Amino acid sequence: MKTLKVGLCGAGNVGRAVLRTLIQSSQLLEVQGGVHFDIVQVGARRGKEVVPYEGINITTNLEDVATNPDVDVLVEVIGGVNFAYELVTTALKEGKHVVTANKALIASHGNELFTLAKENNVDIGFEASVAGGTPVIKALREGLVATKVKWFAGILNGTSNFILTEMESNQSTFESALKKAQELGLAESDPSLDINGTDAAQKASILAALAFHVPFDFSLVSFEGIEEIELEDLGYAKELGYSIKHIAHGELENNVVCVSAYPTLVDNETLLSQVGKEMNALEIFSEGIGSTVYYGPGAGPEPTASAVIADLVDIAKGGWDLDINSDDQNKLEVLDRKRAARYYRLQVNDEPGVIAKISSLFGDQNISIEALIQHEAKSKENLESISVVIISGEISNNEAVKLKNALEDLPEVFSGVKKFRIHAGEK
């Protein structure tokens, strides 16, 4: 039986879950994985206080683990970027494999880390960096290796999905839904990276590198968060047959790759629209197969630990020969020419001719109107206004922004115009 000597850096919730699983499920891992794991050393800044197991070599100096000659593979679950980068590069230069759950690290430094790993004939496992315990990276690395991926779309941040589910299902305000997520441990005390779209965008960057064989380049990922979504938008979307989800999306067309993470209207007949609470899901569309969907818990100590240990088993069995940037024909670009239908919500004066004027503006810009609904104002402050919601035809990002600005310039329109993408689905 293969023995793998493990050094663990990080003893927070995820680190302790990894350690607990390796110890308590050792027999199961030997039977099902064919691997015996020897925990050589654990790096924890608070030492024995957070590692309640006897007989384990614990150090408060995490660099010791990265340089320990008895360690075969370093597991990095400390989070952050700078110090994690130092630890991982040290371990790779020492000829050690690395397993990480750190999406920010991979999205920011993936190119140089994989180059360094290749130079030292070692592997990097990063399944836990995207979608927690749902094996989406393994699907791209192995299950879909014989197909050409055309696009992917998914819900990759459990915090934002929980908030939107609460708002839609219980008519909760954004603030109360966020507070509930924090009370349940589904959101950090500072949830900014989750709600402003950064977390999902980092994950989308990683998936794009695997799906389309382009370099990691987080700077070319376009993204927005969910802060601007209001209960009105969720209600109007439902009336039109949609749900609003925060969708990470990547697409390859004519050798150009565009990657994004945006609030998006999703047809209620699709599987992604049914993904609720803190769950994650990813739909991958590839030639010859069509759509495959992966669903499961996207975060939490146990799902993340499961993904980490799956990578450890794969490394013990020989790892992967992974060349991320293997297709020089494909080019990653900022999302500007990707065409999609758009949702616009305007608050306008309740007077004759307003709808005709808005329709004329769409016509002037050669943009079709696919659907239009209007309602009386929902607040006492705006009794002399009406809400108008318009679904446009497919337009580029530049056209969508230009149209939004033109609508806001109309004297009959007041307050900001809301604009969201619409996911087209299979094609």
Question: Which residues fall in each region the model found?
Answer:
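N-terminal glycine-/serine-/threonine-rich beta1-alpha1-beta2 phosphate-ribose binding loop
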Residues: 1-94
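Rossmann-fold NAD(P)-binding glycine/threonine-rich loop
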Residues: 84-90, 103-141
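Oxidoreductase and adenylate-handling cofactor-binding alpha/beta cores
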Residues: 136-149, 160-172, 202-216, 311
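Substrate-binding/catalytic subdomain of NAD(P)-dependent oxidoreductase enzymes
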Residues: 176-274, 279-281
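Catalytic, metal-anchored helix/loop core of enzyme active sites in primary metabolism
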Residues: 57, 149-153, 161-164, 168, ...
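A conserved regulatory-domain signal marking ACT and ACT-like small-molecule sensing domains
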Residues: 312-427
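A short hydrophobic/small-residue beta-strand
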Residues: 97-99, 369
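General beta-strand structural signal in soluble alpha/beta enzymes
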Residues: 58-60, 75-76, 99-101, 124-128, ...
